[in-house]
Design a protein with these regions (language model features):
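Class I SAM-dependent transferase core
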Residues: 2-102, 118, 131-141
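Conserved nucleotide-cofactor-binding alpha/beta core module
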Residues: 90-188
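Short, composition-biased local secondary-structure segments
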Residues: 1-2, 107
Length: 188
């Protein structure tokens, strides 16, 4: 078997094979066909952004808890999105190299890392202090320098870094907060 896209990874490596299977069996069937996105999923190592207790699940088609305890995870609902959802978001956002991006809900920093490869700069906001630090550490370890991680509540706090070309909410809301809409550049 040879790996498609622009990877030089060894296909006999179990992690590389798991990543390949994730792309072929979860992401492509979800109509994510943008080769730049597929290449990026080979380059940004998802497993490095998953909490150590869940690394074995890094490529599974599921949301991965980001909180240390199941009780805290249920209370806060903090999780990594399923890989197919992350890939579809990345494809549909059509981020350009000149874009400034705001992400609400940093989590582990993985989505910010993906966005950073496509954008000029990413500002990511996280409400949970431990996850702010986790995202910062992960992004630093991955060598990603064009992301600013801030602690705050995207629905309530003032965000001084706008305007933005793209705003991503890595969670659910009943209604898009007006303060976020005000930060979106015209045409964004």
């Amino acid at each position: 078997m040879t790996l498609p896209y622009n990877t030089t990874a060894d296909a006999s490596d179990p992690v590389t094979l798991s990543r390949y299977n994730m792309i072929e069996q979860q992401i492509r069937p979800w109509n994510v066909l943008d080769t730049d996105v597929l290449d990026l999923l080979n380059v940004v190592r998802r497993e490095d952004f998953v909490p150590p207790a869940y690394r074995g699940m890094a490529f599974m088609d599921m949301e991965i808890p980001l909180n240390p305890s199941a009780e805290e995870a249920q209370r806060l609902g903090q999780c990594m999105l399923a890989p197919r959802v992350e890939a579809r978001l990345l494809q549909d956002l059509q981020v350009k190299p000149t874009d400034r991006v705001l992400e609400i809900g940093s989590g582990s920093g993985y989505m910010a890392a993906l966005l950073a490869h496509r954008a000029e700069h990413v500002v990511t906001l996280e409400i949970v202090p431990d996850l702010v630090e986790f995202a910062r550490e992960n992004l630093l370890s991955a060598g990603i320098a064009n992301v600013t991680v801030r602690q705050g509540d995207g629905a309530r706090d003032a965000i001084p870094d706008g305007p933005f070309d793209v705003i991503v909410l890595s969670g659910s809301v009943h209604e898009v907060p007006q303060n976020l809409l005000a930060l979106l550049r015209e045409g964004g």
